[in-house]
Design a protein with these regions (language model features):
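Terminal amphipathic helices with adjacent charged low-complexity linkers/tails
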Residues: 183-217, 394-421, 428, 470
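Conserved mixed alpha/beta core segments that line enzyme active sites in large multi-domain catalysts
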Residues: 36, 50-80, 243-244, 261-330
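Phosphate-backbone binding interfaces of nucleic-acid-interacting proteins
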Residues: 1-205, 341, 357-362, 368, ...
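A carboxyl-terminal module marker
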Residues: 23, 440-447, 627-836
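Glycine/proline-enriched, intrinsically flexible loops and inter-domain linkers
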Residues: 4-7, 11-12, 26, 66, ...
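Mobile "lid/hinge" segments at catalytic clefts and subdomain interfaces of large enzymes
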Residues: 114-128, 133-139, 143, 150-160, ...
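Short, hydrophobic beta-strand segments
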Residues: 3-10, 159-167, 223-231, 364-372, ...
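Extended, well-folded interaction surfaces typified by the phenylalanyl-tRNA synthetase beta subunit core
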Residues: 414-580, 798-800, 805-806, 810-836
Length: 836
């Protein structure tokens, strides 16, 4: 949002000095309206004078030049000019005398053009950066005094424009009046001097109402509509002050009528629209939803197919505007317009937002309507100001008007407790200052008691809905810098109640799984009994914990996390074909094996605990590649390794036919283990779901889904999470292709390489070493070129030194020795291992 400093000062009625642009920027930023930049305009224009043409003759040596006799208020000068729109003798122009420097950097000096001296320059608005028209010179009004400085006659020529970053909850700050209101309230409360707004009066010439002028057929989408029929309009270019003001704010001047509506947009934040009433069938408008297959050509020349949910402004026959977004070409104001219907309305923000997005049409009007404009006195004030300017600049007069209301939002009443404000802010805002702040923001305060203020919110502040919003307003204007610094540490430090070890372990594991690209779900702990029967080999039916009052057939506490994850997989695959990567952290429940009470109990356990269901905290992971693609269990074990690393554990994989689980494919499952002082500890399993389980959940036959689970209680405690310094020098990598029997797990191949690297003798002060944690399995190939019963593993190994970069001459012999030693070790268990 661009705010003109000069215009803002015109809107402020201050007893004290006017804030400088820098001071104003500091005030606004402190109020939450962050000033992102200051743009200064008019440098060099201070030297521009009002020149009067005393005579003009054709240049004797150049057909396109005119020799002008120009009076600058003190002397008559000769100036050569090539413009074709020179005014007649007596006309006024913008004159740059010798020595002036234009905004673009051009310095005016005496020149001789084809033998005729030129003692200055007659300027265009483009050369003065007052507009974009560079085809002709800038012609000034005849009433401007000759010899006067131009910037003293036209407000805004020398100006500073503040660029604000307005947050979406402050639609009132999308106009100069709203920003000026904040500044006035701030100055009144902080300085104690009188500060108020200068606003145009709410009056209009006596004119009869015509209720047929406007009809609202969609009252839930249009809360208020003011329509004014204006006649005797003369469309012409806007005066210089209006053109300059719009140009400084980034808008292109078009004509007096259109420019007036744009000026009101920037002044009040209220969009207005002018229809050519002569082009409206019946001379009236209807606010309605678009008809089926109705179309509209908007002002940008685009033919748009309207949706039945679009709100339109129509005449007796067709849609004439997309309400709150853009007008229609068929009723636009043109040079021949003599009758106008002026619209000032409040539309429901949600509908305008939907239409703007549906048609990919964002405008200054829709930007404000989407956030909520004033439907109260601000709407009337913008309309009255526009009517006054139309009468002044275009000669128009109002012959009829109408006000129609639909479902208009009510004014909110909020109870404010000063004691509550002091408690939340940590500082008590003095009563007088608080009342002054609220009054400056036009919030009506009715004191029902010393600690109970009933506040009526103005219609221009839709963001004020709760007591804390009013407290926030008090803090904005009282100032964060007024909050005293307080030593908040308690005198007697007490130890904080920390989370238990299992909770911390679960949180870290969940963080690691999220970092690995998995999404966490939370499913119900109650499931249908028939779903748990698929896991009866692990937890038999007699250990099910049944619920006394089951809901929707879910009468058993879950013994496994997999049913909830599979339900989520079915739900997602039925709606999209994208990959599904899920995990859940939760408890499972089962009765203990046997009901005998032991003679002794572990420390911290009560005797009654053995008669309660056993609870295990588990982590379940499920990966599906999307569509009919197959998930790779290795991607799952990689995610597990990354997550366990956050807990300080290194993952080990081991396979075998003993201790297999029935819900995983018997040929594609491994045990998950972590290192401990006593050796590897099994903490879970991973692999591919059994085809029978895929069929039981109605998933496509042949679909391969990876699943893994971790028992958090089985993880050994780690007091210190392992960490190391990030290497300062890059490692170098070597790719290794090994031909191995299919039965030999890749984990054993990596372990052999790791052992070979550790056994490699070191040489020198900073030897090259194999990075044990950096080995990767890039590819598992089975097919042409590989003997039957074997596969080709493509591995990547990384080598580095602690304090320097390494060279190929160092790495190559090291790599060859490690590969040879690892292959020898592997051949003892699986003959046929060889590099490719």
């Amino acid at each position: 949002m661009l705010i003109s400093h000069s215009w803002l000062c015109e809107l402020l009625d201050l007893d004290g000095p006017v804030p400088t642009p820098e001071a104003l920027a500091e005030i606004l930023t402190g109020l939450g309206l962050e000033v992102e930049a200051l743009h200064r305009h008019g440098a060099g224009v201070e030297a521009i004078l009002v020149g009067e043409i005393r005579g003009k003759t054709p240049h004797p040596q150049a057909n396109k030049l005119t020799v002008v006799e120009l009076f600058d208020g003190q002397q008559t000068l000769t100036v050569c000019c090539g413009a074709s729109n020179l005014p007649p003798v007596g006309g006024k122009v913008a004159f740059a005398p010798i020595g002036a420097r234009l905004p673009g950097g051009l310095e005016i000096a005496p020149r001789e053009l084809r033998g005729v001296p030129s003692q200055g320059m007659i300027c265009s608005e483009l050369e003065l950066e007052l507009g974009v028209d560079g085809d002709g010179i800038l012609i000034l009004p005849d009433e401007f005094p000759t010899g006067a400085r131009l910037h003293t006659l036209v407000s805004g020529i020398v100006d500073t424009v503040l660029e604000l970053g307005v947050t979406p909850n402050r639609p009132d700050a999308l106009g100069h009046v709203g920003v000026a209101r904040d500044v006035a309230a701030y100055l009144s409360a902080r300085t104690g001097t009188r500060s108020a707004l200068r606003l145009p009066p709410l009056r209009m010439a006596e004119t009869s109402q015509d209720p047929t002028l406007v009809t609202i057929a969609a009252p839930n989408r249009c809360g208020r509509y003011l329509g004014y029929a204006i006649t005797d309009v003369k469309v012409a270019p806007s005066p210089l002050w209006l053109r300059v003001r719009l140009h400084r704010l980034g808008l292109r001047p078009i004509s007096n009528l259109v420019d007036i509506t744009n000026l009101m947009l920037m002044q009040f934040g209220q969009p207005l629209h002018a229809f050519d009433r002569g082009k409206l069938a019946g001379g009236r408008v209807v606010v309605r939803r678009a008809h089926h297959e109705e179309g509209l050509r908007t002002l940008d020349g685009t033919d748009r197919a309207l949706d039945v949910d679009d709100l339109v402004i129509a005449d007796a026959d067709d849609a004439q505007a997309l309400a709150g977004v853009m007008g229609g070409e068929s009723s636009m104001v043109g040079p021949d317009t003599t009758e106008v219907l002026l619209e000032a309305a409040w539309f429901a923000p949600a509908g305008i937002r939907a239409s703007a997005r549906r048609h990919a049409l964002g405008t200054d009007a829709s930007y404000r309507y989407e956030r909520g404009v004033d439907h109260g006195v601000g709407l009337e004030r913008a309309a009255m100001a526009a009517l006054s300017l139309i009468s002044e600049l275009a000669g128009g007069r109002v012959v009829a008007w109408a006000e129609v209301c639909g479902e208009r939002p009510p004014r909110r009443t909020i109870d404010l407790r000063p004691a509550r404000a002091a408690m939340l802010l940590g500082v008590a805002v003095p009563t007088g200052e608080a009342r002054a702040i609220l009054a400056g923001l036009e919030i009506e305060v009715h004191v029902d008691g010393p600690q109970h203020w009933r506040c009526v919110v103005p219609t221009h502040r839709p963001d004020l809905v709760r007591e804390v919003d009013l407290i926030d307003e008090l803090m904005r204007h009282h100032g964060l810098d007024s909050v005293p610094a307080t030593f908040c540490i308690p005198r007697e430090a007490r130890p904080a109640a920390g989370a238990d070890a299992m909770t911390v372990r679960g949180d870290r594991l969940a963080d690691g799984l999220r970092e690995a690209g998995l999404q966490e779900i939370v499913s119900l702990a109650f499931v249908a009994e028939d779903k748990l029967l698929n896991f009866s080999d692990e937890v038999p039916e007699d250990r099910f914990v049944r619920v006394a009052n089951p809901m929707r057939g879910a009468g058993v506490m879950r013994t496994h996390l997999l049913p909830g994850l599979l339900d989520a997989l079915v739900h997602n695959t039925a709606r999209h074909g994208r990959p599904v990567r899920l995990f859940e952290l939760g408890r499972t429940y089962a009765w203990p094996k046997g009901k005998a009470t032991p003679a002794s109990f572990p420390e911290g356990t009560r005797a009654v605990d053995v008669h309660l269901p056993q609870e295990r905290t588990m982590a379940g992971l499920l990966l599906h590649a999307g569509g009919r693609n197959h998930a790779d269990p290795r991607a799952l074990t990689g995610a597990v390794a990354q997550a366990l690393a956050r807990l300080g554990h290194r993952l080990h994989l081991s396979s075998g036919t003993d201790h297999q689980v029935s819900f995983l494919h018997p040929g594609v499952q491994v045990r998950l283990a972590v290192e401990a002082a006593t050796g590897p500890i099994v903490v879970g399993v991973a692999g591919e779901l059994h085809p029978d389980l895929i069929a039981a959940w109605g998933l496509p036959a042949g679909l391969r889904v990876a699943y893994g689970e971790i028992d958090l209680a089985a993880l050994p405690p780690t007091d210190v999470v392992l960490a190391r310094e990030i290497p300062r020098f890059p490692a170098t990598s070597r790719d290794l292709s090994l031909e191995v029997p299919i039965a030999l797990p890749a984990a054993e191949v990596l372990a052999a390489l790791r052992s070979a690297g550790a056994a490699q003798p070191a040489s020198g002060d900073d030897p090259v070493h194999l990075q044990a944690d950096g080995m990767e399995v890039l590819e598992d190939y089975r097919g042409a070129g590989v003997p039957e019963g074997h596969r080709a593993l493509l591995l990547r190994l990384h080598y580095a030194a602690a304090g320097r970069s390494v060279t190929d001459l160092e790495v190559s012999p090291q790599h060859a020795a490690i590969v040879e030693r690892a292959c020898l070790a592997l051949r003892g268990r699986a003959p046929g291992v060889r590099p490719r």
